[in-house]
């Protein structure tokens, strides 16, 4: 048996790969001899323990593969106890105790590949009990360190149970339970890390799971739960490298003790009891060893170093108890675990803030794998699920257990600068956490003092500003009077009506309304003189020009010099009527024949020998009497009939024209233009033309050198050839009986 044993540190997959060809070649001699009832199969079936060509090295492929093939045929041929290997697809012919499995057609290379796959599931953790072919019966020996899965299959197969029962009870149910637990934890972690349950509830669930696990372990002490196969992810590998080496050392130490027990006692039942007693002690040693380790080892797998202090309390080594790390403020990116050197420095900075709680001593190896799988899960969920990152983070969604670490960190005056990010974090980090940085942690950073300082600064700034006076707007530019006369009044009845109705056709509508707001409201009456003498202001402007001019052509852009209106052409009917009214009220005064001598006699007789005060009945009555006497004398001087009744004397014309406040030389110039008879009095047409020239001069127009005939014709009003009789039959000079006014 010594020649068939492989070295302790040898890898089963490597040996199977190197000897696959030789094993296939050995199938020609070894398997043939077994099928034909050769010496190897007969010797093993009889239980003599003599080696065959495959076992002792006499055959072609001596070594581990030949040993396993021999074990397979030995177990199937002897009929005592189950085989240590999985049965070939041919069936269970060897279990009947027949003569060597004559119906088997599987090659040794297939069996070697199956052995290599079963051994290379995980690193070696302990020795594997196998049947002693030399001793026969149920004796168990330790050959080499193999995986936990292989050990569980072998231990379950040793005994009087059937091979089908070994597969159903020993291997599948623990795997199914572990997978269900793993998926349950994954579903529990598949939510937003901010909206998870409180740590206290999670702790209670873990306690109940540990109690149930202890009860199962006490009821079935002979079973060893195989290690679950975790997903090949880069994050759990760091945690596995931290926790596995210590447990593997314990496993090697326990394997040596178990091999000593197997060497001293060779009976089958005694060896099973020793193995059953060794396994619980080995499990307790592992749990006690893992109790002292989490304070130092699991930190590299559970810390996220490049985050500010608000996120350190929730990502501390206390995640063994609280499995969901919660995202607090100031997490710009979700980073993968960094190298252990940086992690140790960040862990030392975080130690004064967070207290590490040790794990309970009664935790087995399966719990360690659960915690290792449980801690990286929230990172994977936060990277994969975008809906949880996009959710709105409010104050009510944050658990109450995560509030106190944040306040504790905020009370510290200084925050350490975050270290440089690893280059792999660019591809893993998501862009969504900065949005939560803008919404959730903005309010804690604004303290009460900063808010009050900002409010006081704004109040002081507003108080120091000089108050502006909006009541006096800047002056408006002068309006452009295109197409209007410079003497046109600014406000007319049309503009006032448009302002009251709300519509305006002029560009100065806003200026008019602003002026009206400052003063009192105006009525429909125009504020300025709407009854102006300027006929140009009353004309309608901006009308479309006549399409046909005097020449008959359709030249819209011609100047039409002969068809335009000129102020020197004629006097309008309205102006003529106004001037005639002034003439009618002043005509014939002081022109009654013999009026001067009669006026002198009347004044002397009235004021004869007494003073005006003596004639009156009180003070002031003399002045009133004089005014009345003067008015009566003036009215008595008016000529009632004859040619003198149509004239306005020069003194009366001078008195009326002097009210225009024009210089005396200009008034004399106007008199020379209109006094055509040189008789010291003006007729109706002459007086009307004189008033019209004075009005034109007041509007800024020059006094013409001569008055055109059209103006005289318009002043006559259709009455041509009015004969004005001269008083005294030509004594006034001129020798002409009359002239056309």
Swiss-Prot record:
Residues 303-312 have a biased composition (Pro residues). Residues 436-461, 495-525 have a biased composition (Polar residues). It comes from the Eukaryota. SMART domains: EH. Residues 18-151, 183-567, 603-641 are annotated as: Disordered. Residues 26-36, 46-65, 94-104 have a biased composition (Gly residues). Pfam families: EH. InterPro entries: EF-hand-dom_pair (IPR011992), EH_dom (IPR000261). One of its GO terms (biological process) is lipid metabolic process. The keyword Lipid metabolism applies. Residues 385-406, 603-616 have a biased composition (Low complexity). The keyword Lipid metabolism applies. Residues 629-718 form the EH domain. Residues 183-195, 202-218, 268-280, 367-376, 624-633 have a biased composition (Basic and acidic residues). Keywords: Lipid metabolism. Residues 224-233, 539-566 have a biased composition (Basic residues). Positive regulator of phosphatidylinositol 4,5-bisphosphate turnover and negatively regulates signaling through the cell integrity pathway. Involved in rDNA silencing. Belongs to the IRS4 family. This is Increased rDNA silencing protein 4. The gene is IRS4.
């Amino acid at each position: 048996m010594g020649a068939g044993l492989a070295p302790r540190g040898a890898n089963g997959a490597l040996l199977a790969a190197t000897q696959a060809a030789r094993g296939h070649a050995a199938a020609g001699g070894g398997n043939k001899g077994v099928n034909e009832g050769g010496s190897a199969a007969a010797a093993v079936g009889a239980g003599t323990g003599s080696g065959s060509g495959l076992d002792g090295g006499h055959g072609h492929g001596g070594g581990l593969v030949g040993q396993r093939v021999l074990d397979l045929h030995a177990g199937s041929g002897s009929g005592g106890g189950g085989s240590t290997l999985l049965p070939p697809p041919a069936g269970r012919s060897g279990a009947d105790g027949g003569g060597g499995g004559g119906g088997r057609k599987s090659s040794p290379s297939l069996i070697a590949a199956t052995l290599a796959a079963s051994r290379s599931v995980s690193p070696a953790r302990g020795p594997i009990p196998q049947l002693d072919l030399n001793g026969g019966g149920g004796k168990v020996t330790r050959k080499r360190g193999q995986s936990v899965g292989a050990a569980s299959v072998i231990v379950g197969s040793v005994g009087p149970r059937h091979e089908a029962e070994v597969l159903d009870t020993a291997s599948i149910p623990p795997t199914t339970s572990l997978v269900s637990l793993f998926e349950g934890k994954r579903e529990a972690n598949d939510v937003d890390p901010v909206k998870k349950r409180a740590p206290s509830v999670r702790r209670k669930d873990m306690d109940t799971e540990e109690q149930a696990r202890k009860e199962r372990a006490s009821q079935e002490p002979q079973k060893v739960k195989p290690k679950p196969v975790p997903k090949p992810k880069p994050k759990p590998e760091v945690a596995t490298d931290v926790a596995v080496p210590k447990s593997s050392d314990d496993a090697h130490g326990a394997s040596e003790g178990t091999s000593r027990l197997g060497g001293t006692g060779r009976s089958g039942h005694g060896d099973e009891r020793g193995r059953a007693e060794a396994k619980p002690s080995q499990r307790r040693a592992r749990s006690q060893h893992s109790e002292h380790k989490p304070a130092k080892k699991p930190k590299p797998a559970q810390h996220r170093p490049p985050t500010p202090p608000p996120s350190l309390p929730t990502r501390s080594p206390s995640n063994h108890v609280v499995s969901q790390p919660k995202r607090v403020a100031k997490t710009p990116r979700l980073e993968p675990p960094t190298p252990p050197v940086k992690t140790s420095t960040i862990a030392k900075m975080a130690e004064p803030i967070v207290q590490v709680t040790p794990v309970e001593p009664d935790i087995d190896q399966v719990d360690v794998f659960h915690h290792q799988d449980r801690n990286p899960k929230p990172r994977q969920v936060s990277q994969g699920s975008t809906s949880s990152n996009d959710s709105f983070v409010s104050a009510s969604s944050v658990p109450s257990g995560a509030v106190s670490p944040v306040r504790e960190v905020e009370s510290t005056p200084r925050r350490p600068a975050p270290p440089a990010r690893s280059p792999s974090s660019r591809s893993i980090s998501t862009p969504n956490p900065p949005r939560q940085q803008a919404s959730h942690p903005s309010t804690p950073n604004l303290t009460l003092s900063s808010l009050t300082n900002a409010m006081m600064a704004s109040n002081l700034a507003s108080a120091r500003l000089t108050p502006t006076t909006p009541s006096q707007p800047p002056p408006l530019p002068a309006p452009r009077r295109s197409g209007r006369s410079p003497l046109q009044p600014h406000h007319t009845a049309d503009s006032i009506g448009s302002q009251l109705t709300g519509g305006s056709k002029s560009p100065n509508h806003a200026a008019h309304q602003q002026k009206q707001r400052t003063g009192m409201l105006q009525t429909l009456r125009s504020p300025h003189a709407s009854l102006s003498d300027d006929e140009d202001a009353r004309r309608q402007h901006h009308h479309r020009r006549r399409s046909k001019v005097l020449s008959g052509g359709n030249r819209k852009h011609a100047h039409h010099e002969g068809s335009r209106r000129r102020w020197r052409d004629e006097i309008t009917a309205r102006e003529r009527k106004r001037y005639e009214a002034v003439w009618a009220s002043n005509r014939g005064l002081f022109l009654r024949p013999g009026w001067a001598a009669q006026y002198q006699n009347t004044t002397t007789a009235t004021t004869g020998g007494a003073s005006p005060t003596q004639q009156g009945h009180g003070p002031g009555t003399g002045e009133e009497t004089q005014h009345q006497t003067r008015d009566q004398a003036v009215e008595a001087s008016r000529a009632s009939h004859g040619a003198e009744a149509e004239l306005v004397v020069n003194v009366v014309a001078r008195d009326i024209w002097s009210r225009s406040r024009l210089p005396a030389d200009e008034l004399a110039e106007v008199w020379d233009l209109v006094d055509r008879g040189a008789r010291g009095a003006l007729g109706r047409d002459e007086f009307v033309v004189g008033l019209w020239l004075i009005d034109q001069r007041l509007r800024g127009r020059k006094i013409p050198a001569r008055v055109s005939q059209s103006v005289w014709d318009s002043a006559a009003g259709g009455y041509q050839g009015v004969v004005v009789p001269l008083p005294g039959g030509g004594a006034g000079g001129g020798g002409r009986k009359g002239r056309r006014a």
